[in-house]
Amino acid sequence: MIKAAYFPTIIYAKDVNLDNRLFEKAVIDWSNKDKGIKRTNMKGWHRTTEMHKIPVFKPLVDELFKMQNEIFQEEWLESEPIIGNMWANINPPGGYNRPHVHPNSHFSGVYYIKAPQNSGQIIFNEPRATAHMVMPRRKQGEPPPHLWREVRVNPLEGRIIIFPAWLWHCVDPNESNDIRISVSFNFIQKGFNV
């Protein structure tokens, strides 16, 4: 039998060594001065979206561009990546993010500044809506990845995760006794009009 996998959904990840304590201090200072904005964040804080222009975050922005340039090459994309927007999130105990996508972007991602154990997994959902029309019963046990209906990823300090902006995702409630701090961002092709 010939077997081929078409239409894959690629999720990229990379661990980087940056000064997360410096980033944490900057984000907490902002949250003490700025009430934030409401998007998909429930019980959490979401900063306004021009964080990539703030000098203290340049080392992170540089790492994001390195990774995104590699992804653009692998994905055969013309032009070059630009950051559409970037913002910080603080999810206190009980805080979570509702299911959402990121319109007007090609790739979205997250970087974890502070991620205590049990502070909420990011969950990526099966993107093919018609795959839910008739869901077969499966054998007991762990099916191979190509049969999964969702992918759960534990947050890890210093990890960047980048995924297609159209991929539905959410964040589980923070069940730790501490805050989780992350940075979210969107990339688009330079010159692309949305």
Map each language-model feature to its residues.
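Karyopherin-beta/Importin-beta family HEAT-repeat alpha-solenoid scaffold
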Residues: I2-A4, I161, V171
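Short beta-strand His + acidic residue motifs that chelate non-heme Fe in jelly-roll/DSBH
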Residues: N97-H100, H169-S176
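Catalytic core of non-heme Fe(II) oxygenases with the double-stranded beta-helix
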Residues: N91-I162, Q189-V194
